[in-house]
A protein has these predicted regions:
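Short secondary-structure junctions and interdomain/linker hinges
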Residues: 3, 69-72, 76, 188-195
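Short, charged low-complexity intrinsically disordered segments located at boundaries
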Residues: 35-36, 50-56, 94-99, 189-190, ...
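Charged, low-complexity, helix/coiled-coil-prone segments
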Residues: 2-5, 12, 90-101, 113-131
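Hydrophobic protein-protein interaction segments
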Residues: 105-239
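Basic, Lys/Arg-rich alpha-helical nucleic-acid-recognition elements, primarily the DNA-binding modules
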Residues: 1-47
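Charged/polar, solvent-exposed surface patches and flexible loops
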Residues: 6, 24, 32, 60, ...
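Hydrophobic transmembrane alpha-helix bundles
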Residues: 22-35, 70-81, 108-125, 232-238
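Helix-turn-helix/homeodomain-like alpha-helical modules used for DNA recognition
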Residues: 38-116
Length: 239
């Protein structure tokens, strides 16, 4: 007991093994503790969907971003920049089938998850709701700059066709996804012509002739700067 008390009083430091044990048992993040002490260090957050409970962890990631974006409505200096090789979440998450397809593709690629037919995959309503909130609130960002890979739509079309060819998406459902994609392109055309969202905030779109290997995003507000790199379909590395 005395050894424990000495550690709690700070007289004796915890060993790495002891610190790891405390972290695991109590759910304390050692990264965050270190980050508080060393402000000059770059801290990274791996927003990885847990394959043991993919829906819940995916929901938690989106909900965290929704809470963040919800604070930006009254920030006149909020800005988002992204260079993408896929259609950004800020645009496709409002469309249920396109959002479902992105999650379905991740599940198919993950060997730990037994992938179902697209029509059999049931997305919980709370995920649909938080996706809609994410897409709607993102329009409150006062300035958004999109730089897109010229293949951004072709990548998605090829993926959809692949799953159709292996009979995991029916012809009828493929047509439904196509209709959502056409609706999305109409929305993009309107945004590109106006240069603004429905809330009157600025949007700039540039199509690059150079292909991107990943998607990179940067969000800046009066209070913070956030950088994100998309990894493995729906996951991200954030700092």
């Amino acid at each position: 007991k005395e050894a424990v008390y000495r550690r709690l009083r700070g007289e004796v430091p915890f060993t790495l093994q002891e610190a790891a044990l405390v972290s695991r048992k109590l759910g304390i993040s050692l990264d965050k503790i270190i980050g508080i002490s060393f402000k000059s260090n770059a801290m990274f957050d791996m927003n990885i969907v847990d394959y043991d409970d993919p829906f819940e962890s995916y929901y938690n990631i989106l909900y965290k971003y929704v809470r963040l974006i919800n604070t930006l409505e009254d920030d006149p200096n909020s800005s988002l920049g992204t260079s993408s090789n896929i259609i950004p979440q800020t645009l496709y998450l409002k469309h249920d089938l396109l959002a479902k397809f992105r999650l379905f593709k991740w599940m198919y690629q993950n060997e730990h998850i037994k992938c179902k037919h697209f029509e059999e995959l049931e997305i919980p309503q709370k995920i649909i709701n938080v996706q809609q909130d994410f897409a709607k609130l993102s329009h409150h960002i006062h300035s958004t700059d999109y730089i897109w890979d010229s293949m951004v739509f072709l990548h998605l079309i090829n993926d959809i066709q692949y799953f159709s060819d292996i009979h995991l998406i029916s012809d009828e459902m493929k047509q439904n996804i196509k209709e959502e994609l056409l609706k999305l392109t109409d929305e993009l055309e309107s945004i590109a012509m106006k240069g603004k969202t429905d809330f009157g905030n600025d949007v700039h779109i540039y199509v690059s002739q150079i292909n991107f290997e990943a998607t990179y995003s940067y969000l800046e507000t009066n209070l913070m700067q956030l950088s994100m790199i998309r990894v493995y379909s729906i996951n991200s590395l954030t700092t």
